[in-house]
């Protein structure tokens, strides 16, 4: 498989006044969607760490993969997906989604069990040229030691992206591997800082058992 579609959704759930059972029900309902024919990989869970230059306070994350935009669209309108979305409306305070094409699919479509996912979303400054966008994505593709897989791409679904236009997701073996490359990633950020208006970084744990 040469390319895949990456689909990332960030949720802010109103967990202050909501029965935790409703949150668990939503998360479990989303994770059951992995059984749909269109889905190559899907995981939803709580955010371990959120780093952002704005006041965003998302609490949960969904990452899923598809063969094509058509499969993503079919997933979006599938009755099971529509039902889960409708059932969770009352506990969602905020939501955003970013989709991109990974031109080279990772060898393993499902990340290793027990690994740590790291999503980076960028909102670029106005009038950033196409050449600069390509440069940004090349910088973000740099694969440090400890990264099992990484994809980067330009968002093609602006409707719910809050103007974030570039996304990347990488999977590390554990938190220690992320901490080990912190300095390298800061240098990476310095290379693209002049083009970036806002950044959201999300880290989350992939369960150690399926």
UniProtKB/Swiss-Prot annotation:
One of its GO terms (biological process) is response to fungus. Induction: Induced by salicylic acid (SA), jasmonic acid (JA) and infection with the fungal pathogen F.oxysporum. Residues 5-100, 116-204 form the Stress-response A/B barrel domain. Keywords: Cytoplasm, Plant defense. Gene3D superfamilies: 3.30.70.100. PROSITE patterns: S_R_A_B_BARREL. Pfam families: Dabb. Signal peptide: none annotated. InterPro entries: Dabb, Dimeric_a/b-barrel, HS1/DABB1-like. GO terms for cellular component: cytosol. It is found in: Cytoplasm, Cytosol. Its main location: cytoplasm. Involved in defense against fungal pathogens. Possesses antifungal activity against diverse pathogenic fungi. PANTHER family: PTHR33178, STRESS-RESPONSE A_B BARREL DOMAIN-CONTAINING PROTEIN DABB1. Homodimer. This is Stress-response A/B barrel domain-containing protein DABB1. It comes from Arabidopsis thaliana (Mouse-ear cress). The gene is DABB1.
